[in-house]
Amino acid sequence: MTKLSSRDIKKIIGAVTTVIAMGGAYLAKEAVALPFLHKSNETPSKTIKQGSTSNQDKTELNQKEFKSGMAIKEDVNSGKSTLNPSEWVGPKITYSPLDSENRVGAATAYLTKENYGKSEGREGQKWSPTGWHNQALKVNGKRVFPQNRGHLIGYTMTFNLDNDGNKKPGELGSIDNPKNLFSQSSYSNQVTFQTYEEMVRTSIKKGSKVTYRVEPIFKDNELMARGLWAQAVSDTGDLNFNVYIYNVQPGVEFNYSTGTSKANPNFEVK
């Protein structure tokens, strides 16, 4: 056997060390790269899931059909808002522009106590939202006006904001703002929706910061909304709801394509 010199031994040790170092670097690279790839695969999945939850809610609401005898409202997401109170950016309101059919879209309000107010006299409303046909009907012997100009964000919660939703001290509220009005049944407005509006008013009057979103749900190209999706959450935890309210009226049937209506004494709303 040939005896290795000390110089040859050093060369061999150096070569082995290099190989080990290269292998270690590769393994280290893989150890770093694989968790990164795994994480990058998880993040889009989570984002898609979060986005689809909201979209799924709206898709399901679009598919709902009210039948005589049903309840006028139902909870969405078990009645819990999906809004994030930590993203409050107010006081302001973000209105949607009118769409190609001239229909109103969602409005998201970031409200405080300074947005609550009352005025001694309200200006008249001249704007006619899509589907506006408020001719009186005789229902069960009574004269009924089936529609209201419904506010997405209630008039008394829009003080000190202009019609674009930006802060403007001294403004007396959004009365006749096309981006805040839709054709709403008088029953859903005055009996049902008003209950939730009062919950929001109570919260901001107590000093809470409230994130509040309201969206009319239209089907296809219909001019009158089938319902109203409303949710709100406060920074103090005193307010949290998520509800869908059908745009219906006892004793009245609406043609949602046009907003016209006819009396039907057998049409029931619970």
Predicted feature locations:
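Alpha-helical interaction segments
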Residues: 16, 55-56, 78, 122, ...
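N-terminal, intrinsically disordered, polar/charged segments of Gram-positive cell-envelope systems
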Residues: 31-91
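Hydrophobic membrane-insertion alpha-helices, especially the h-region
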Residues: 14-29
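Domain-level detector of nuclease and nuclease-like folds
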Residues: 104-270
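N-terminal Sec-pathway targeting helices
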Residues: 2-15
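Polybasic, low-complexity association/targeting segments
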Residues: 68-117, 243
